[in-house]
């Protein structure tokens, strides 16, 4: 059975451009060392100039403006001489296979470390009309693949060692097939569809799990109807969540349907989408690649009339759930199908392809790049302004050697960092077995300069309806916020992830691009009940603080009453200092939020990698009653256990040595905590001496990393240390400080690990590691939400209760805020109704308990911003009676009063790990992922450089391990008590899910 028409045979010799058995990574490192000024990043990323004619045109139009550089041309490819120790280790000649990049596993430098890999699956190893894979067909008109030669083999190319090997996974493999699809979900490869010796393959999803030392095949159970058997279709993981399957051929005709599987919703189910907008026609042999921000780009293909297509289409999901197609801007250099395409940051690299009738894409058009930041196509020569009319005859061999290398079809491509790999394919009736590589140095150049330089070339050649900038194809925000306004807070064009997990990305296509606007969700009528949880525990304390204020026990001058000083509920304008007032629309010179955020792709451990357990919002319930937290007698008896002495300095070192393992830490098999109460007492004594000597408001310097709520999710803390540097002499503690914004305990399963490690780091690096207090650093709160239970469960009732009391006494000494460079203030909650000046916080005397605190302390630890920038003044807080939310006007007033430019606070779970408010003058930060196993949120930190540019860095939630499903005994033993706690006392809902609009006029519950 033939899948396509023939390819006219040619006798080509592929040049060998790389040195023998040297990995592309090693070549890249050597090339970097040979460059002059290799230490300068900008030197290696300088893009090429536009063509001379374009330069002259730009100079004529703008004679007074220096010409800007444009997008780089497509890179050239060379052959990789990979190591193949045994014949079966090499994939050999084949076509119709898939090549998928998989990130590294394990800790680098250890025996268990496995570097980035390319996984090759399936494909055809023979052609119709000949028995060998590399021979000439018996007929020039019949060179279709021989389905009897389709395989289910798995081969692995280790990028670092430059070595091929054949894998023999456990489990039942998929049937032999070609023209199938595959995509990576973390360290897993999902395979679907295709055609083999028995005909069309079933629509089942097969997963190759590479998280373990030996890979394993799994079959994913999917309910309901799905795409059905098909081949020549496309599939990609969009937005780290949706598996999208599009088009192909069902054995009768080409298709144009779109199917989505939400990996965050169980049971798994395919859903047929009906996207709006102008989409691609029914076609097969196209390519689909997902950009990191959730934009899917479908390129090329062959329609029902066997005509090759040139257009590219973007598919994006709106915040309201709608999907929409849009035609990508720019002019493609050539139509094509059976090509390969892969994103490297914001640049889509397209290679090879067929034109039908035995012809292939040749000349400079055989390699092309769609620069989605600039909105233009480039080939190996220049920006493309019209379709190329080069030679496309099948007998035109010779010419540029690099072009000859990529003149092929039915091959496969994958990217590792800024390296693009191509394997195999078909050329002139000959199956290929070569591995090619190219390096895209322009991958990081997603700049407004590139957009401006390309605009002149693209403006007059953009067909009607192809609007650059739709769905972020180009950086349309450049026109709104030019580079001449350096202090504007901008979210820049997204850049796709390299395989090591790091990526630069626009902050999620599902999020509002306008600061202060949040997503909504169904079931919001349940949020009022859920959000009353923690406030119920603190309501008595808040009432006592108000009573003391009324009775004069706590003196608050008029200026300290904030919004309460005016009948309208808004702050008095007289409170704003005339000499410090700044425009509300632009942050003053100095502090800026970087236009990109660094994201770590979700690691995997389940059947579909990025799948995260998710509970419906209607499962949130009100908090239950308190539990007892022991008696003074039990605490006194426990204290008598301290009958031995230990060196003060030995305990912190023991803790750091035992716990600071960013890549190697695993939850202990035994829940018994590794420290006894004597050691914890020594650790607390050492840390308390340091905290007592520090001011209530810390004075810190940049550079510094800022962490939000951790809530006992120690694994997330280790992942953040692993991805973005750890506080050790082997890490980055010598040149950057660490600041933690509170809520170290409760909710998570490893509060003891979290707080003891942070205290040990404070003792070891007291001038570099800084901790301030959160609302859960209080006995009344952490008695209810997990910390006390964990202490008892892991240390025994007597020791556990004593340790819980001792750590809470230490919490009373924690500083309450931090000023960075006197321009940024960091706190846990917010400014509430009462805080107008930093001096109010500085005047709070420590140690202090919640019961003894004032309204200022309550606001500092408990208040939140309002729903969005349009809600000003003060509003009741959904957390519970007596608590408030504050609007953007309060933020601006506070910044003006104190000559500040930014407030960084934690306290609320936000979907992307960080969220802007008050036109970027306030950032909410949350570092724990998938809060309480229900929120499915990312975790983030902020990195403030010496230039006061704030860079968000994110990690995604980890999915449940496939080897330990939710119903397994291991998982049941591990977290039964914590699951019960979260069911009985659900967390405060994720920020951005507002109250039901029908209930907004009814706030009597406050």
UniProtKB/Swiss-Prot annotation:
Keyword vocabulary terms for this entry: Hydrolase, Kelch repeat, Manganese, Metal-binding, Nucleus, Phosphoprotein, Protein phosphatase, Repeat
GO molecular function, one term: protein serine/threonine phosphatase activity
GO terms under cellular component: nucleus; peroxisome
Pfam family, any one: Metallophos
Cofactor note text: Binds 2 manganese ions per subunit.
Kelch repeats: 138-184, 242-290, 295-345, 351-398, 419-465
Annotated EC: 3.1.3.16
Family affiliation: Belongs to the PPP phosphatase family. BSU subfamily.
Residue sites binding Mn(2+) 2 per the record: 743, 775, 828, 907
Active site feature: 776 (proton donor)
Low complexity composition-biased segments: 38-47, 54-67
Species whose genome carries this gene: Arabidopsis thaliana (Mouse-ear cress)
Entry annotated with the keyword GTP-binding: no
Gene that this sequence comes from: BSL3
Localization annotation: Nucleus
GO-annotated biological processes: brassinosteroid mediated signaling pathway
List of residues that carry Phosphoserine: 616, 964
Known catalytic reactions: O-phospho-L-seryl-[protein] + H2O = L-seryl-[protein] + phosphate; O-phospho-L-threonyl-[protein] + H2O = L-threonyl-[protein] + phosphate
Cofactor: Mn(2+)
Taxonomic placement: Eukaryota, Viridiplantae, Streptophyta, Embryophyta, Tracheophyta
Superkingdom classification of source: Eukaryota
Protein name: Serine/threonine-protein phosphatase BSL3
Ranges for region Disordered: 1-67, 454-494, 552-579, 982-1006
Tagged with keyword Repeat: yes
Sites where the protein binds Mn(2+) 1: 709, 711, 743
Tissues expressing this chain: Expressed throughout the plant, with a higher level in younger parts.
Function in brief: Phosphatase involved in elongation process, probably by acting as a regulator of brassinolide signaling.
């Amino acid at each position: 059975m033939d899948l396509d028409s023939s390819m006219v045979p040619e006798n080509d010799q592929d040049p060998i451009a790389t040195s023998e058995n040297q990995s592309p990574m090693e070549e890249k490192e050597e090339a970097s060392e040979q460059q002059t000024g290799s230490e300068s990043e900008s030197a290696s990323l300088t893009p090429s100039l536009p063509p001379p004619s374009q330069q002259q045109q730009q100079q004529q139009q703008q004679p007074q403006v220096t010409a800007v550089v444009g997008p780089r041309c497509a890179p050239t490819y060379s052959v990789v001489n990979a190591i193949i120790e045994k014949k079966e280790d090499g994939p050999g000649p084949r076509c119709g296979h898939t090549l998928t990049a998989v990130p590294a596993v394990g800790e680098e430098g250890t025996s268990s470390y496995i570097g980035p890999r390319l996984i090759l699956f399936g494909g055809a190893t023979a052609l119709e009309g000949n028995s060998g894979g590399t021979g000439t067909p018996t007929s020039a008109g019949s060179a279709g693949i021989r389905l009897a030669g389709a395989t289910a083999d798995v081969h692995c190319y280790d990028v670092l060692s430059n070595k091929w090997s054949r894998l023999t996974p456990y489990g039942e493999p998929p049937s032999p097939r070609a023209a199938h699809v595959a995509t990576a979900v973390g360290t897993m490869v999902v395979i679907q569809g295709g055609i083999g010796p028995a005909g069309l393959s079933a629509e089942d999803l097969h997963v190759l799990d590479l998280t373990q030392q030996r890979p394993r095949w799994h079959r994913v159970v999917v309910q309901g109807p799905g795409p059905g058997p098909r081949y020549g279709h496309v599939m990609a993981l969009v937005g780290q969540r949706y598996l999208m399957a599009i088009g192909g051929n069902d054995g009768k005709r080409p298709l144009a349907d779109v199917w989505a599987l939400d990996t965050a919703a169980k049971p798994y189910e395919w859903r047929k989408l009906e996207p709006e907008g102008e989409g691609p026609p029914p076609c097969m042999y196209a390519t689909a690649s997902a950009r990191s921000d959730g934009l899917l780009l479908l390129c090329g293909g062959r329609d029902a009339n066997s005509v090759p297509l040139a257009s590219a289409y973007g598919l994006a999901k709106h915040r309201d759930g709608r999907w929409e197609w849009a035609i990508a801007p720019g002019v493609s250099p050539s139509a094509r199908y059976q090509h390969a395409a892969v994103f490297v940051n914001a640049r889509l690299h397209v290679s090879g392809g067929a034109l039908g009738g035995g012809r292939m894409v040749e000349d400079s058009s055989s390699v092309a790049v769609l620069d989605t930041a600039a909105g233009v196509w480039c080939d190996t020569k220049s920006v493309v302004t019209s379709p190329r009319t080069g030679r496309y005859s099948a007998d035109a061999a010779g010419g540029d050697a690099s072009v000859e290398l990529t003149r092929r079809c039915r091959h496969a491509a994958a990217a590792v960092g800024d390296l693009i790999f191509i394997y195999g394919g078909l050329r002139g009736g000959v199956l290929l077995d070569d591995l090619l590589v190219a390096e895209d140095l322009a991958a990081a150049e997603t700049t407004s300069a590139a957009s401006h330089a390309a605009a002149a070339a693209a403006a007059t050649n953009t067909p009607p309806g192809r609007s650059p900038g739709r769905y972020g194809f180009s950086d349309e925000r450049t026109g709104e916020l030019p580079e001449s306004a350096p202090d504007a807070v901008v979210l820049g064009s997204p850049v796709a992830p390299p395989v090591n997990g790091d990526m630069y990305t626009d902050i999620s296509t599902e999020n509002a691009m306008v600061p202060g606007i949040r997503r909504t969700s169904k079931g919001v009528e349940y949020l009022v009940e859920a959000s009353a949880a923690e406030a119920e525990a603190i309501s008595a304390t808040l009432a006592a603080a108000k009573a003391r204020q009324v009775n004069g026990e706590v003196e608050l001058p008029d200026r300290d009453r904030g919004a309460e000083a005016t009948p309208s509920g808004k702050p008095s304008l007289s409170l704003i200092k005339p000499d410090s007032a700044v425009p509300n629309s632009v942050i003053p010179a100095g502090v800026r939020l970087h236009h990109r955020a660094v994201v770590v792709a979700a690691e995997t451990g389940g059947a579909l990698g990025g799948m995260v357990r998710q509970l419906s919002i209607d499962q949130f319930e009100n908090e239950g009653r308190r539990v007892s937290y022991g008696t003074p007698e039990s605490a006194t008896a426990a204290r008598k256990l301290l009958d031995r002495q230990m060196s003060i300095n030995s305990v912190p070192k023991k803790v750091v040595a035992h716990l600071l393992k960013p890549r190697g830490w695993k939850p202990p098999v035994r829940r018994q905590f590794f420290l006894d109460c004597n050691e914890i007492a020594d650790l607390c004594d050492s840390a308390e001496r340091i905290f007592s000597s520090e001011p209530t408001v810390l004075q810190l310097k940049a550079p510094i990393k800022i962490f939000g709520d951790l809530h006992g999710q120690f694994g997330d803390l280790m992942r953040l240390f692993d991805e973005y540097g750890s506080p050790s002499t082997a890490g980055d503690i010598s040149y950057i400080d660490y600041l933690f914004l509170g809520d170290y305990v409760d909710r998570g399963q490893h509060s003891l690990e979290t707080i003891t490690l942070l205290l040990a780091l404070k003792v070891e690096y007291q001038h570099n590691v800084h901790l301030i207090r959160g609302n859960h650093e209080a006995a009344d709160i952490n008695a209810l939400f997990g910390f006390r239970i964990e202490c008892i469960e892991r240390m025994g009732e007597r020791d556990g209760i004593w340790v819980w009391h001792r750590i809470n006494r230490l919490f009373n000494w924690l500083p309450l805020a931090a000023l960075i460079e006197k321009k940024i203030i960091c706190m846990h909650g917010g400014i509430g109704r009462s805080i107008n000046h930093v001096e109010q916080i500085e005047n709070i005397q420590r140690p202090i308990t919640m019961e003894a605190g004032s309204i200022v302390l309550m606001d500092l630890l408990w208040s939140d911003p309002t729903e969005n920038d349009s809600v000003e003044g003060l509003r009741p807080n959904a957390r519970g009676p007596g608590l408030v939310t504050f609007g953007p006007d309060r933020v601006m007033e506070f910044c003006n009063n104190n000559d500040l430019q930014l407030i960084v606070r934690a306290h609320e779970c936000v979907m992307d790990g960080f969220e802007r408010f008050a036109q970027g003058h306030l950032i909410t930060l949350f570092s724990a992922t998938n809060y309480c196993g229900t929120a499915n949120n990312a975790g983030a930190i902020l990195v403030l450089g010496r230039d006061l540019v704030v860079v968000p860095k994110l990690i995604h939630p980890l999915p449940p391990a496939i080897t330990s499903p939710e119903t397994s005994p291991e998982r049941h033993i591990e977290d039964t008590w914590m699951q019960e706690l979260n069911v009985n006392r659900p967390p405060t809902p994720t920020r951005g899910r507002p109250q039901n609009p029908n209930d907004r006029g009814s706030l009597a519950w406050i």
